[in-house]
């Protein structure tokens, strides 16, 4: 996939950017490019990943400061053009803080940091994010977060359900998320935010390859 480039955004405090690059280049032969958060030129990338970590130290709230960066401002036109954006963990938090996805990520119900492999159900394949997977199919991905509890009001939940925007649900809810939600898409289907880490499940030697379904979807046209 030498002609296709995935941009990986790097904020102060990002710590999963190189993991994402390794997964895409090493496991899928997809070219990547690191994008410093102060950049606003996205013309030479075809898809974008907002990786996990602790952008700006997660001060105020997770993603609350990152949403003011020049690059996030440029995402408006990028998303409108139909190109794909994947937000993983802290990236999901940034997408909700920036208004690209509805709801919010708040502290886990038990107030503890959770690091574990979790079973998930694919609820919708809208936008082609889970290629070759059927709805309600089970996958296993790692989670690692302290503020991964997805919260939304009942009107928002109804909109998510009615418009088929819930991408993933936890089989056993680890953090208190509303309706067991682990990931959602926008209405156009080209933006996906999820708390689990697909880049940590892309090689059998590190526990599984279920993350490849999501990462491979970055090159869907």
Curated annotation (Swiss-Prot):
Disulfide bonds: none
Active-site positions on this chain: 89, 197, 199
Annotated organism of origin: Prochlorococcus marinus subsp. pastoris (strain CCMP1986 / NIES-2087 / MED4)
Catalytic activity from the UniProt record: N(2)-formyl-N(1)-(5-phospho-beta-D-ribosyl)glycinamide + L-glutamine + ATP + H2O = 2-formamido-N(1)-(5-O-phospho-beta-D-ribosyl)acetamidine + L-glutamate + ADP + phosphate + H(+); L-glutamine + H2O = L-glutamate + NH4(+)
Gene3D superfamilies according to UniProt: 3.40.50.880
Domain Glutamine amidotransferase type-1: 5-221
EC numbers on record: 6.3.5.3, 3.5.1.2
Listed name of the protein: Phosphoribosylformylglycinamidine synthase subunit PurQ
Compartments where located: Cytoplasm
Molecular function terms from GO: ATP binding; glutaminase activity; phosphoribosylformylglycinamidine synthase activity
Keyword Hydrolase: yes
Pathway given in the UniProt record: Purine metabolism; IMP biosynthesis via de novo pathway; 5-amino-1-(5-phospho-D-ribosyl)imidazole from N(2)-formyl-N(1)-(5-phospho-D-ribosyl)glycinamide: step 1/2
Keyword ATP-binding: yes
Pfam families: GATase_5
Domain of life of the organism encoding this protein: Bacteria
Keyword tags: ATP-binding, Cytoplasm, Glutamine amidotransferase, Hydrolase, Ligase, Nucleotide-binding, Purine biosynthesis
Subunit structure: Part of the FGAM synthase complex composed of 1 PurL, 1 PurQ and 2 PurS subunits.
Major localisation: cytoplasm
GO biological process, alphabetically ordered: 'de novo' IMP biosynthetic process
Primary role: Part of the phosphoribosylformylglycinamidine synthase complex involved in the purines biosynthetic pathway. Catalyzes the ATP-dependent conversion of formylglycinamide ribonucleotide (FGAR) and glutamine to yield formylglycinamidine ribonucleotide (FGAM) and glutamate. The FGAM synthase complex is composed of three subunits. PurQ produces an ammonia molecule by converting glutamine to glutamate. PurL transfers the ammonia molecule to FGAR to form FGAM in an ATP-dependent manner.
GO cellular component, one term: cytoplasm
């Amino acid at each position: 996939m030498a002609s296709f480039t995935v941009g990986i955004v790097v904020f102060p405090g990002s710590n999963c950017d190189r993991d994402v690059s390794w997964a895409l280049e090493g496991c899928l032969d997809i070219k990547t490019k690191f994008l410093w958060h102060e950049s606003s030129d996205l013309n030479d990338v075809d898809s974008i990943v907002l990786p996990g970590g602790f952008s700006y130290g997660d001060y105020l709230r997770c993603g609350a400061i990152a949403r003011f960066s020049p690059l996030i401002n440029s995402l408006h036109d990028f998303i409108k053009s139909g190109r794909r954006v994947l937000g993983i963990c802290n990236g999901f938090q940034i997408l909700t803080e920036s208004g690209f996805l509805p709801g919010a990520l708040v502290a886990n119900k038990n107030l503890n940091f959770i690091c574990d492999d979790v079973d998930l159900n694919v609820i919708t394949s809208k936008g082609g994010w889970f290629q070759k997977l059927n709805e309600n199919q089970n996958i296993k991905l790692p989670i690692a977060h302290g503020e991964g509890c997805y919260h939304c009001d009942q009107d928002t939940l109804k909109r998510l359900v009615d418009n088929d925007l819930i991408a993933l649900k936890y089989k056993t809810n680890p953090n208190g998320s509303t309706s067991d939600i682990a990931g959602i898409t926008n209405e156009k289907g080209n933006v996906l935010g999820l708390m689990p880490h697909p880049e940590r499940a892309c090689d059998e030697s590190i526990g599984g390859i279920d993350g490849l379904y999501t990462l491979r979807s970055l090159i869907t046209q």
